[in-house]
Amino acid sequence: MFSIKSIQLCRYFSRKSGVLRYWHSAPYLTHSKLLEDKLIRPVDRSKETEKLLRSRLVYQSRKRGILETDLILSGFAKEYLSKYNVELLKEYDNLLNEADWDILYWCTGERQAPEHWLNSRVLRDLKEYLSSKNGVVRFMPEL
């Protein structure tokens, strides 16, 4: 179990992406682990409408922090989010709470996703989206 003292957690809020970023001295600590240990509290969005949720997710998919993840998630959001119900949108929202590099490695298969993401339909759809577009040059979709 990690504590605040042991990981020397430092966070900042990125105005560009609206996503919390973390640095730590622990060997490998994901955003999910920080949430599980209640080291951080997510923003309460319980009263958010479906339309607002969908719009926020499209925006957050475009403005991540690293270009590779921006390109993958923005195209994925344009193609898939309109088909998702509220439950899947919330699952995608939870995925966006993960670090950019983790999402990139998990969806490309470079690293194994944590156990709680292994049966995720969203992550499975994201992997399918990437594999079906092999050799395609990606551009940021229009807003």
UniProtKB/Swiss-Prot annotation:
Gene3D superfamilies registered for this protein in UniProt: Flavinator of succinate dehydrogenase
GO biological process, one term: tricarboxylic acid cycle
Alphabetical list of SUPFAM superfamilies matching this protein: YgfY-like
Pfam families, sorted: Sdh5
Keyword Cell inner membrane listed: no
GO CC list: mitochondrial matrix; mitochondrion
Family affiliation: Belongs to the SDHAF2 family.
Protein name (database record): Succinate dehydrogenase assembly factor 2, mitochondrial
Organism the protein comes from: Schizosaccharomyces japonicus (strain yFS275 / FY16936) (Fission yeast)
